[in-house]
Amino acid sequence: FCPTCGAAVRPALAGWAQRCTNEADGNRVLFPRVEPAVITAIVDGHDRLLLQHNAAWKDSRLYSVSAGFVEAGENLEHACRREAMEETGIKLGEVRYLGSQPWPFPASLMMAFKAHAITTDVRVDGEETMTARWVTRDEYTAELIAGRMAAPGRATIARYMIEEWLGREL
């Protein structure tokens, strides 16, 4: 329903928007709200990658990089630092932009970063992040081959970030 007049809405612009059906209100075009989110590949001084398992993931083998929504009044780099601290207790130094990916559900835009850890002692929150660990390229490859870890899906920016660190496609 139209948030201005309450009339029904119909898909518009090939599904990227909605159009109000109220002609008296000008059949206004409505665009979805986009929720900004950050996703961060965190590396330490030994070029190990921090991977974590989220409590919401059904596959216990799935590990990915840090991610979370940007809060009101927060810049993207601060969101990366806050999420890393909240989820793993890791303090970040330099944070560098890598790219972005639309994430349709829940209407999010994922902005990807690579960050360098200042601290390496992992302390997961136990609520959102259940486990987290540092891995070398050889350790990660061995975990994947043994089936003890699973990588994020092929169409995700998380997988691209891991492959960029790994130096090859999975």
Model-derived segments and spans:
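Cys/His-rich microdomains that often coordinate metals
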Residues: 1, 6-9, 24-31
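Hydrophobic alpha-helical positions that pack around
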Residues: 66, 80, 84
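Surface-exposed, charge/polar-rich loops and edge strands
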Residues: 74-75
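The −1 position to Zn-ligating cysteines in a subset of zinc-ribbon hairpins
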Residues: 1, 16-19
